[in-house]
Every structure is written in C-alpha cells, then in structure tokens.
A protein has these predicted regions:
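HAD-like aspartate-dependent phosphatase fold
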Residues: 1-380
Length: 380
C-alpha cells in the first residue's frame, strides 16, 4: 500500500516556510519488530536485576499482544482499548480477553482520565514493548502464584522504569549502533523527496532528543549515501538540533549550544541563531530569531504528546504525525467492506421485525393485548 497523507484540517504547503522532523521513527524509521524485540529483551534483563523470577527469561516478544493507543490499568492488571470518547471498548487481563459480563462489572460507565495515576498510556513506539511484556508478566503472575511477583501496579512501574533506564543508559542504542542494517531502514525515496522540498524553497530542520553521536551516526548511514544535490546532510538540513529535551523544548527556556559537526564539541551561542548544528535550546528563541510565526512551521513527529499535543498547545506550530499502525488498519477495513455491506443488508431486513415487536410490546403494556407467542418468536 503506498504511503498516504490524511488531514483533519486544511494545510496549505505554500504558506509553510520551515519543515521540522523528529529523527527516531520519523525521519529515520526503524525495523519495528527487530527493535521492539531488542527493547523487550533489554527490559527483561533489567527486571531480572530487580529480583524478578528467572522464568521471565523465557518470554518472547509477541507483536500481536499490543498496539500503540492502548491503556494499561495499573491496579487491575488489564490492557484497555478506548473509543474516541475514552469509554472502554475492550479489555484484556494477561493474555486473555475479559468476557462481557466481567468487563461490564469492572468498567460499566467508566471513562478513562489519563491524568490520574491509575492508568498508563501506550502512546509511543518505546512503550509498545512495555505493553507486550506487561501482559505477559500479568499472565505469569496469575498462573504461578508460588512465584514472587509484585502487585500489578508495581509491575507496570517497574516495566516503565526499565524501559526508561534502557534508553537513559544507552544500552538500547549501543545495540543499534553495532548492527545498523538489522535495525534501521534505508529509504532513498524519502531523501529524494527532502531534496525536492529544499529545491522548492522549503527550509528543513531536525529536532530530536537523541544526542550528537547517535544523530550523526544515523544520518551518515541513512541519509548521506542517497544525497544527489547536496554534499552532506549538513547542507540539506538548515538546522540539526540534538538533545532537545522535548516536550520541554516547546515551553521552557533552555539555552542553545553550538555543536561542531566534526567532533561534537560545543560552544555557547553568542549571536543570533545561524544555520548549523545545535544542542538543547527552546522554541521561543528559535522562532523569534528566525522571524517565524507558529503557522510558518510544519513539524512532523511520532510522539502523540511530546511531538504533537504539547507543541500545538504551547507554540501553535502546524503538526503532522507518522502513524505506521494506520496502514494495516486501512487495509483491514478495506478487506472487511464486503462483510460490512452484508451486515448493513441484514440490519435493514431486521428493521420491520423490530418495528413489529415494538408495536406488540406497546399494545401489551397500554391495551392489555397479549400475543406472547409472536413476541417470543420475534425476540429470537
């Protein structure tokens, strides 16, 4: 299926002066299953150091167990699927779906408020493997009461801490660095498109939370080999801002440091921002010194909160989101169209029977006219 762009608000690209890109999972796409398996393995290693039973070594990453957009109920050990109104459409405990009666008993008329401490959003690629592992650990805890597992909420917190630690201590990225071909997608067409935008007068910048060394490594690997109209990715990108600390970049006043692209050494920025490579900084200084309004910038990212919601709230930049899960969702909806059409036909056939049942029930209540045999037949 060819990649497509969907909009929920009109976007006139002629008015966009700067196009900003997150790096990880946006400009540079990962081979998701390989990366999530790695993340799953690293988190298990860290949980073992925290005293979790050795049996968790046997757990294998299963990408069918979760998807971004779900919510973890920390206290009950459940994985929840919400609708657009934050009502709960489906729930799983461990590896098993809760049956309808149990689901209704626990969650009837419940609307999820993610600002409360009882729930954890699965809203990034990095939390995807966390959700998979959490469901597996809940299953192990329930099926092995003799093993020393913490309570459900503690398991969720430990998994989150372990994921954060794996990113913070560099253990994940060190593995990626050792085998870039196994984890990173090369996309020559994407590089060609970026050069085309640059040719048409758009200025392109990178805004990433990754550090200088990792950023340079990935850009050298996935961008530089496919450049045709630029000598270096430094010529393609007007600004490369590393270690940006998003979402704080959008609302705090951290200072910019200029980075020497050759060796990563940093110096203070004394003058106005000029094209080049930087660390840190803040959105207010970036837009003010470049003479930009919020809607002059289109920023593309993959993090619902860190890249999209907070950015819209604080800076009014135009935003776009990379949502890989949308592609199979659209494909599945297309495959289901014949079934949906059949259901629609059957629903129309059902309508006159429902109308007749309503009339009979009304007459029974209001006029005492009883035709229980026909009512029973219609209710079947």
């Amino acid at each position: 299926m060819p990649a497509k762009v969907y909009v929920n608000r009109t976007l006139n690209m002629k008015k966009i002066r700067y196009i900003g890109l997150d790096m990880d999972h946006t400009l540079i796409r990962y081979k998701s299953l390989n990366f999530e398996r790695l993340s799953h393995t690293k988190v298990i290693e860290k949980l073992l150091k925290r005293g979790y039973p050795d049996v968790i070594k046997s757990l294998q990453f299963d990408d069918n167990l979760a998807i971004r957009g779900l919510v973890i109920d920390r206290d009950k050990g459940n994985l929840l699927k919400l609708n657009r109104y934050t009502a709960i459409r489906a729930s799983f405990h461990g590896l098993k779906p809760l049956d309808f009666k149990m689901h209704q008993k626990i969650y009837r008329s419940t609307y999820i408020d993610l600002s409360t401490g009882g729930y954890m959003a699965v809203d990034t690629f990095f939390s995807y493997s966390l959700a998979v592992l959490y469901t597996q650990l809940v299953e192990l805890k329930d099926s092995n009461p003799n093993l020393q597992f913490p309570e459900y909420a503690r398991i969720a917190d430990d998994c989150l801490d372990a994921v954060d630690e794996a990113h913070r201590d560099g253990s994940l990225k060190e593995e990626v660095k050792k085998n870039l071909d196994h984890y990173i997608i090369k996309d020559p067409k994407m590089v060609e498109d970026l050069e085309k935008y640059k040719k048409h007068g758009k200025k392109i910048f990178i805004l990433t939370n990754s550090d200088y060394h990792y950023t340079k490594l990935l850009l050298d690997y996935a961008i530089a080999p496919f450049l045709k109209e630029h000598k270096s990715w430094l010529d393609l990108f007007e600004f490369v801002i590393t270690f940006a600390q998003k979402p704080k970049f959008f609302y705090e006043g951290n200072r910019f440091l200029r980075v020497n692209p050759a060796d990563g050494t940093m110096t203070n920025v004394e003058d106005k921002l000029a094209p080049g490579m930087y660390q840190g900084g803040n959105a207010k200084q970036f837009t003010t010194e470049l003479g930009l309004e919020g809607d002059d910038i289109l920023y593309i990212g993959d993090h619902i909160y860190g890249d999209i919601l907070r950015l819209k709230k604080d800076c009014n930049w135009r935003t776009a989101m990379v949502l890989e899960e949308l592609e199979p969702e659209i494909e599945n909806n297309a495959k289901a169209e014949p079934i949906n059409a059949e259901i629609e036909v059957l629903m129309k056939q059902k309508e006159p029977f429902e109308d007749e049942l309503t009339v009979l029930m009304t007459r029974k209540i209001e006029e005492g006219v009883v035709d229980d045999g026909k009512i029973e037949a219609l209710q079947k």
